[in-house]
Amino acid sequence: MERFEARLRAAEPEVRELLDRVPLLPTPPFPPDWLRCEMLERLDVLRHAPLEHAGTVLEVGSGAHAIATIPLAYDVGPEGRVIAGERSRWGKFLAIVAGSGMGDRIHPVACDARRLPLCDNSADLAVCVHGLRSLQGEENSVRIVREMLRAAPRVFLAESLPIARTDAQSAHLAMYDLREDVFLAASGTTDDLRYAPLERLASLVEAAGGMVETMETLEVDLPHFLAHFPRTLVEGIRPRDLRQRLLQRWDEADAMQRRFGEDHPPVGIVVARRR
């Protein structure tokens, strides 16, 4: 975590104060400040978003820890607001938001992003940060991006790319690429799909009726902690041959993470507008 601590020391005082208010979450094998590190990455990514000060932002897939929600609320300022949409995985969301001091800017909405309970043009910008991989396939993703473009005239999409330039990025991908296969075998659900190339993100936008304005790749250079999952999940898979193959892959990925750590892959960013 030395790079995170160095980046934090170099950050604006307001950013340090914001992250200091984010609670420490001891979640082995992660360090207690893993959530603060992830939020710093989101702040980096959102510097590339066309956010308006005092604007209204719709976030699709705010998740259980408000990892992008709180940075969004910080960026829009005290007069802005974030409509935080999430279907079911609220977890510690409300407690983390309350501790951050951003609660008056954040409006959580329980909803299915395929049918957003919002009028047309309810927001200035719709965003999905590191969430496309959880939208359960291309058809679903297109439908949700289409809804985002109905609720806001512009969208901002950011997602990790299937690129590894360092051993620590390779360690992340080795574990992350197991998630889809393991979850499908263990529960029959397809969640955390493999990362898609930047061109695929752009094609999703175009299929949803959007027009790409800009595309870029961002190098983050920060640790990442969200690929790891318990070995016991693999141990519960019934088909013996499949279980053994996946256990071997899990052990190899875990060994890589212990040796090299785990870093964010490059992040693909797409900004688009409604046609």
Residues of each region from the PLM?
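Class I SAM-dependent methyltransferase Rossmann-like catalytic core
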Residues: 7-43
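Conserved alpha-helix/loop element of class I SAM-dependent methyltransferases that forms part
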Residues: 35-54, 71
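Class I SAM-dependent methyltransferase SAM/SAH-binding core
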Residues: 58, 63-115
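A conserved beta-strand element that flanks and buttresses the S-adenosyl-L-methionine
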Residues: 127
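A short, conserved alpha-helix within the catalytic core of class I
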Residues: 135-147
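Conserved class I S-adenosyl-L-methionine
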Residues: 156-181
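Short alpha-helix
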Residues: 192-209
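Conserved Class I S-adenosyl-L-methionine
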Residues: 213-275
